[in-house]
């Protein structure tokens, strides 16, 4: 299955742009695929298989952090714009707004030079001027420990060096991100320690989307 998948069907969200956000390995791609199938939307996935920096980044993070983040920003901007230009509803596995979380954590851990980080932030802000926002972001709320467990279970060689400390820092940064982004984009927080039924999640998204509420916590 490629980065994009179109399925048939109609729903109250047929023209909605839904972003699925969360830590590494929590199940974003699986939920994005299921939601797309259920709601009759197009699914867009993270550019993992053809990421030319992925292996190098995990092998020598400090050396490749800037190149990796710029590569991902470029690819995700392209995907984001394709969704907008298509004029159709879509579910996106990780939004472009989350990229800045990873860049800031890399800087804080001394794995990205402050000069490179400032260049990255400037580039991100310039691109942001041309972006229409998603209609809603679904945040899959998972502990760093559960994220680490799921990463181990899927056994991707390139992810073998991901530490629990890195995930803890990411989780803290995500919490700040969710508060900030909810000021401009409706956010639905879904407890995801245990996988939930797609239909139940879709119903919650539909209800919250039509209400246009911000920073809602969905308990399933």
Q: What feature does the model see in each segment?
A:
Residues 2-5, 148-220:
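NTP-dependent small-molecule kinase module
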Residues 20:
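Hydrophobic anchor at the beta1->P-loop junction of P-loop NTPases
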Residues 23:
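P-loop (Walker A) phosphate-binding loop of NTP-binding proteins
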Residues 28:
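Conserved lysine of the Walker
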Residues 37-76:
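Conserved substrate/cofactor phosphate-moiety recognition/catalytic segment
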Residues 64-132:
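Glycine-rich phosphate-binding loop used to anchor ATP phosphates in small-molecule kinases
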Residues 101-172:
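A glycine- and Lys/Arg-enriched "phosphate-lid" helix/loop adjacent to the NTP-binding pocket
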């Amino acid at each position: 299955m490629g980065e994009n998948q179109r399925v048939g069907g109609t729903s109250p969200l047929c023209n909605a742009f839904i972003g699925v956000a969360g830590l590494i390995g929590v199940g974003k791609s699986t939920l994005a695929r299921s939601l797309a199938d259920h709601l009759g939307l197009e699914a867009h996935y993270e550019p993992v298989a053809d990421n030319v920096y992925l292996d190098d980044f995990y092998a020598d993070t400090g050396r490749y952090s800037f190149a990796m983040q710029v590569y991902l920003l470029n690819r995700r901007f392209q995907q984001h714009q394709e969704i907008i230009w298509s004029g159709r509803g879509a579910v996106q596995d990780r939004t472009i707004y989350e990229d800045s979380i990873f860049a800031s954590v890399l800087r804080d851990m001394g794995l990205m030079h402050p000069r490179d980080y400032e260049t990255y932030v400037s580039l991100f802000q310039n691109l942001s001027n041309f972006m229409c926002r998603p209609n809603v972001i679904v945040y899959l709320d998972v502990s760093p420990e559960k994220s680490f467990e799921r990463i181990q279970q899927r056994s991707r060689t390139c992810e073998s060096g991901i530490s629990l400390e890195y995930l803890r820092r990411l989780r803290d940064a995500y919490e700040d991100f969710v508060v900030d982004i909810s000021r401009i984009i409706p956010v639905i927080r879904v407890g995801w320690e245990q996988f939930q039924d797609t239909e139940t999640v879709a119903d919650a998204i539909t209800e919250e989307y039509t209400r246009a509420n911000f920073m809602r916590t969905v308990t399933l």
